Every structure is written in C-alpha cells, then in structure tokens.
C-alpha cells in the first residue's frame, strides 16, 4: 500500500495582518494602489507588511518610501528610506520619488519650463501666431529666442532673424548662414555701446571655448563695467571662476544672477557647482531642487540631485546612536504600538545586546530594531528638521518673492512676449532708456538695394548675408547662381526657390520709413499695372508657331525669358504672345496668345512651361523691355456669316472634318503615337462651327500636325474667314494625300518588279 502524497506547504502568510493573506497578494494590492494613485492606501499596506515581518525587507522599505513621497508625507518617507539604507547602501536612482516629492514641496511644479528650453530663458513667441506689438525700438531689434538685443544677426531661410549663437544646428540647415550686413550695420548705428558689450561677451565666450580662462575673464570684466547687472555675463564670469577653482567668487556672481533673475535655471546650476566646490552639500541640494522645480524634465540635474541626496540625507544612517533599542522601547510605549512581532523584535534586540552571544546576532538585532524605528515614523521630528534645513522655510526670506505661489502674480513663461520684469530691465544697457526715448534714426540709405539703388521692396537675404529686393535678386539669379556682391554660390537657394521675406527689415521699413515705402510701392504697382496690360507692351516669346486651343510646351532657359515668364505669373495674367522671327521686321505679323497652365522649375533655374493657345493677334508695333520683345497688338476674330453662306460653311465644315479624320487614320501607327504624345487627341467636331471666335478647335489641331512650312501656317493663322481656312486645309489635305498615294504606288511597283 503506497503512502499518501504529502500536500504542498501553504504559501507564506503575513502574521501581523488582520487577514491571513499571502505576502505576494498583499504586495500586489499595494503596487496596484500605487499605480492607481492611491498613495495613502499603498503606504499603509506596505507599512503594515513591514511591521509584521520577522525580518525587514529592503524592497518593501523602498516601496513605502516611494508611496509616502508621492503622498507628500516627506518626513515619514525619509524615515522609510533611512530604514532601507540600514539594510543596504542606497543608490541614487532609488531616490527618484523622494526627489520628486522634494521638488513638489518647492511649489513650482505648476509652472515648469519646457525641456526644450533648459537654459531657463523665456521661449520665443510661436512663429505661426501673430507677434505682440513691440513697445520700444529696442524690443523690435531683439532676438526672439534669447530676448536680448540682436548680436551678429543671422536671417534664417524662414525670414526670421536671430543672434548667430541662437541658430539651432541640425541637418535642416546644412549651409552656414552669415551675418546680415544691413541689420548688423543698423545695430552698430543705433546701439553702439551695447554692440560693444555684446562683442566683448562674444570674445569672452570664444576664449572660454579655447580654454583661455584668464584672457576670457579680462574680456568679461570689461563687459561687466558696461553692464554690471547683466545676468549672462555674471554667469559667464562665474563659470570662468569655477574653471580657475575660485569658488567663492563664482558663488558671489551666481548668487547675484539668481537674485536678479530667480527663474533662470542656469543660475541655480552654476551656483550649485560653486557650492559643491566649497563642500556645502545641503545648499547644493537646495539649488538642484530649484532647478528641478523650474524644469522637472532636466534629467542630468535630477541625477546629480539624487547623488547629493544620498550624501546629505543618508550618509550617517548607518551610525545610529548606540542606545537605539531603549529609545525605541520608550517611544513604542508612549505611542501605544502593540504589534507582537514588533515587541518580539525589540526583545530580540535587547537579548542580543545584553548577552553578547555573538557579534553577528548583535548586529542583526540592532539593524532590525533601527529599521523598525525608522519605518514606524519614530524619527519623524529629526527627519522633519533635516528637510527644513534643505527646503525653504519662510516665504518672507525670499522664496515666495522668487517663486510666487499666486498664479496671477507669477510670470507666464510660456506666453509669447512675457518675461519677468526684472529680466527686461537687466538686459538693457545703461543708456537704453535714452536711446529708446529718442527712437531709431533711420533713413533710406540704411535700407538701399545695391542693385536698383532704391528702397528695399520685399527684402530677401541670401545665405551670405546680403539683402536685396526680391525682384532684383531673381533677375540676377536668372543670369548666374552667384551673389551679385560677394559672388558666393547660391545654387541651393536657386534650387529651393526659398525666397522668404526678411521680416525684421520689412517691419523696420514699414514703421520708420512709411512715406518712402509708400512711394516705392506706388512705383511697383505702376510697373505691375503696365506689365498686366494685354494689348499694349504685351510680352512676346519669339520661338515657334502656336495655334489657338493647341498645347504648346516650352523649355525656358534664357535669362530674358525666365524674367518674362515670372512677370506673367506675378501679374496674374499668366499670358504672353508667341510669334515667329522675321528677317527684317524682327517679329512675324501674326501671333498667338498663350496662357500658362503650369510651370515646373529645375534646380538650375530653367523651367518647363505648359501653355495652351487662347487667341490670335496682329502685331501693330513692337519694342524691347529688359531684353525680351514686347508688342502692341490687336486681337483677331472670325467674320460670321448667315443665311445661305452659313449653310455652305456648315457643309464645308463637316466635309473637311471628315477628310481630316480619314487622313489621320491613314497614318502609320508610329507617326500617330508621336502626334498624340505632343499635341494630344484631336478635338471633336463642334455642332456650331462659328461658336468660337477663333474657329473650331479641331481645325487648329489639324493645322498644327500637318507638315506645312511656317510661312503657310502663318498665312492661315492670320485669316479671319473660316471658309477660307477650311478651303486651305482641304487643298493641303488633297495635296498630302496625293503624295502619300504616289509614294505607296511607287513602293508597290518596286515590290512587283522585285
């Protein structure tokens, strides 16, 4: 008889809990409560489990600390982490939740800065929205990214102008853009003192990058003589002092910057570095918490803060006072704790301590007792004092002023154009108020196009930094892909056709030269009105024969015709005339008006123009304009007939149409394909032959494909009698058909002879 199988042992229970549930199940309940955001419940579950365990669990201590930190019970959370530290050294990454709780305690979590703006400087207003109205000339000349007066202004492809050091590197801007010559000269003229200040600061930063701190410090001191309260210069000098290990001076400058601009993250970072050099770890942690309160997503600062927390808050956790057990006993009795396992743990600690049975059991007893001491919150007052030493205690001491709790009083850092008032005053030079009250002294010579020698109209800046009128630049690029002034290659600009207006230059002209701009616009409007006239000075393309309703694709590569096509598009007419060249007159007497349907531009500036014939005209006179021909013209229309003449015309129309269809059908397949690919399908016969002023569309299509000399085509184009044109087409078809038949008969005869 085989023995009965032994049942498996029951899962471990949690002896101190009211319900005898497995530890794993209770742990899952706590984790679920934490994930659901019920941190108070999670903390109570983890604490009850720890109190009921015979041996404390480090992972449970960490869970308890995380839950308490999330619940805002920071002194108790600190005790839980102290308990974990007694069971094993804490790692910085284990303190993420505690760090988050401390950051929330600072009181700025509701107004974080974007992770994309780690410097703490206010973001530029969105490019897509309307810009706020500038309050002063200097604000108009400010960089939209750093909010300071433009320094080495660079105009981006989008038309926005920023400081050169504010240009964001990346694959989107493979071509290095140079300083805008026009705007740079304007800044030097209007703000000479501040431009000198920015030059000195730029030289100092350059020397800093070249690892020449002494020379950089000299330039920085010279710049600070001009603007003693400039925060960026104060922080630059603080960084130089850090490099030279002069931590006291670095702390002095960083503190001044933080006092001037409390919401500047970089100021608190530099201050933390200086304090670290002086060994003042608690203050280092405080500055890191300020940084994280301003920008919770700054991971590098978060990691450093967690490292400092290990040093500041948990360095002495292992050295708990020797009489810990008696202290635990007295506090447990005072607070009425009566867990059986807790009392057993205390007795175990006492026995181990008094009997000295072994060093190992003594250490175990003290460790278990100290863990319980911390997780039960018996170290609360000490932990509260420790936190008060690193967190701001009195709003009147400056924190409330630096980091206001009232949302209405707090500066909205994400709103376009809004930065702290202190910020604006500090970023101005000492003479800025005088300069702004006088306004900008501008004249036409400050914004003169080097090509047309007139006021810039629709200013466009090249990558090399030169600014021209849009139309002037396009005309120059028609001839060569080079800058008209410095001869730099502009092949990329020509290929992209990214001619965006330089917004700042246009706005300055609009605000300070309104009368001159009005005169310049009047001249431009007059030119456009003249160019849009479709009877006088009509642009003429001298190239090939064109017919009404027939497609006429063109490859435009000559500079004069590039200009002509561009003007046709800009005026909105999208029309130009097509004529043949004449040996003596220069232009043929008759031509066809074409309408542009599409323009496809190539990187070299040439283009393919898809056009179609619209109407016929006769040239009255012609002349030249900017290299291409123009003409005064009169449009031609067919003379309409009625009565018996109309009946005769209708019969002739049907007959010639049928004759044309038969001729096309008799062509070889290869020739048909060539004709169809170039001219398209033959239009259908129209029921009313006189419905179109230029005549039936099929008649022009057949004239375009018939093998005729240009002189004959031109003569038919100028006819205003539909009957005469149809008779001419019939005669041509008869002649061509006879020739085709003769060739066929000759070919057949040769085959018979062979």
Curated annotation (Swiss-Prot):
Changing residue 562 to W: In a colorectal cancer sample; somatic mutation. GO terms for molecular function: misfolded protein binding; ribonucleoprotein complex binding; ubiquitin protein ligase activity; zinc ion binding. SMART domains: LON, RING, TPR. Keywords: Metal-binding, Repeat, TPR repeat, Zinc, Zinc-finger. Signal peptide: none annotated. TPR repeats lie at residues 23-58, 59-91, 197-230, 231-264, 266-298, 447-483. Residues 528-737 form the Lon N-terminal domain. It holds the Pfam family TPR_16. One of its GO terms (cellular component) is cytoplasm. Residues 112-136, 398-439 are annotated as: Disordered. Residues 115-125 have a biased composition (Low complexity). The keyword Transmembrane does not apply. The keyword Transport does not apply. A zinc finger (RING-type) spans 449-487. One of its GO terms (biological process) is negative regulation of neuron apoptotic process. Residues 426-439 have a biased composition (Polar residues). This is LON peptidase N-terminal domain and RING finger protein 2. It comes from Homo sapiens (Human). The gene is LONRF2.
């Amino acid at each position: 008889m085989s023995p009965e199988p032994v049942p498996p042992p029951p899962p471990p229970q949690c002896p101190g809990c009211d319900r005898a549930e497995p530890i794993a199940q209770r742990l899952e309940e706590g984790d679920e409560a934490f994930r659901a955001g019920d941190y108070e419940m999670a903390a109570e579950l983890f604490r009850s489990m720890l109190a009921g365990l015979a041996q404390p669990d480090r992972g449970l201590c960490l869970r308890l600390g995380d839950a308490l930190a999330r619940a805002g019970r920071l002194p108790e959370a600190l005790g839980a982490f102290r308990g974990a530290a007694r069971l094993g050294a804490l790692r910085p990454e284990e303190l993420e939740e505690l760090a988050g709780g401390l950051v929330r305690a600072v009181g700025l979590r509701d107004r974080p800065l974007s992770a994309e703006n780690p410097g703490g400087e206010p973001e530029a207003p969105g490019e897509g929205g309307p810009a706020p109205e500038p309050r002063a000339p200097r604000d108009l000349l400010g960089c939209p990214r750093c909010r300071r007066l433009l320094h080495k202004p660079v105009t981006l492809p989008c038309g926005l102008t920023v400081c050169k050091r504010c240009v964001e590197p990346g694959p989107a801007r493979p071509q290095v853009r140079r300083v805008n010559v026009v705007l740079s000269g304007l800044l030097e003229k209007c703000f000479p003192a501040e431009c000198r200040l920015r030059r000195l600061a730029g030289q100092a930063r350059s020397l800093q990058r070249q690892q020449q701190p002494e020379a950089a410090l000299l330039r920085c001191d010279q710049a600070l003589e001009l603007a003693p309260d400039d925060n960026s210069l104060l922080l630059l000098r603080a960084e130089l002092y850090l490099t030279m290990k002069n931590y006291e001076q670095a702390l002095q400058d960083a503190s001044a910057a933080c006092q001037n601009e409390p919401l500047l993250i970089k100021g608190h970072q530099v201050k933390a570095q200086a304090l670290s050099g002086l060994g003042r770890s608690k203050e280092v942690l405080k500055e890191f918490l300020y940084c994280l309160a301003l920008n919770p997503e700054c991971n590098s600062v978060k990691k450093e803060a967690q490292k400092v927390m290990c040093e500041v808050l948990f360095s002495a956790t292992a050295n708990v006072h020797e009489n810990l057990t008696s202290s635990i006993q007295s506090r447990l009795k005072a607070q009425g704790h009566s867990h059986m396992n807790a009392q057993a743990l205390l007795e175990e600690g006492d026995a181990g301590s008094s009997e000295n049975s072994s060093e190992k059991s003594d250490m175990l007893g003290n460790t278990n007792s100290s863990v319980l001491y911390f997780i039960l919150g018996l170290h609360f007052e000490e932990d509260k004092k420790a936190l008060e030493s690193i967190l701001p205690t009195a709003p009147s001491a400056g924190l409330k002023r630096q980091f206001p709790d009232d949302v209405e009083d707090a500066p909205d850092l994400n709103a376009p154009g809004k930065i702290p008032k202190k910020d604006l005053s500090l970023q101005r030079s000492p003479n800025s108020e005088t300069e702004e009250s006088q306004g900008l002294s501008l004249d036409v010579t400050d914004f003169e196009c080097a090509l047309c020698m007139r006021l810039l109209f629709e200013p466009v800046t090249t990558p090399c930094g030169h600014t021209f009128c849009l139309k002037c630049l396009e005309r120059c690029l028609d001839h060569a892909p080079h800058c008209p002034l410095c001869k730099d290659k502009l092949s990329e600009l020509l290929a992209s056709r990214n001619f965006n207006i330089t917004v700042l230059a246009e706005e300055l002209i609009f605000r300070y030269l309104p009368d001159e701009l009005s005169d310049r616009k009047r001249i431009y409007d007059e030119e456009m009105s003249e160019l849009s006239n479709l009877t006088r000075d009509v642009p003429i393309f001298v190239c090939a024969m064109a017919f009404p309703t027939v497609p006429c694709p063109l490859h435009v590569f000559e500079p004069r015709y590039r200009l002509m096509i561009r003007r046709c598009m800009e005026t909105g007419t999208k029309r130009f005339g097509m004529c043949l060249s004449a040996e003596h007159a220069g232009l043929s007497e008759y031509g066809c008006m074409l309408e542009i349907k599409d323009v496809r531009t190539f990187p070299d500036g040439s283009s393919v123009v898809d056009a179609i014939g619209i109407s016929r005209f006769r040239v009255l006179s012609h002349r030249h304009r900017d290299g291409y021909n123009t003409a005064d013209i009169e449009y031609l229309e067919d003379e309409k007939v009625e009565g018996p003449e109309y009946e005769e015309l209708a019969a002739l129309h049907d007959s010639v149409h049928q004759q044309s269809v038969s001729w096309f059908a008799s062509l070889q397949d290869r020739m048909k394909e060539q004709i169809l690919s170039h001219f398209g399908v033959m239009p259908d016969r129209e029921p009313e032959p006189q419905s179109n002023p230029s005549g039936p569309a099929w008649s022009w299509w057949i004239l375009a494909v018939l093998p005729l000399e240009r002189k004959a085509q031109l003569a038919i184009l100028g006819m205003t009698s539909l009957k005469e044109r149809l008779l001419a087409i019939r005669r041509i078809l008869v002649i061509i058909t006879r020739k085709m038949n003769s060739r066929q008969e000759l070919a057949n005869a040769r085959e018979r002879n062979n």
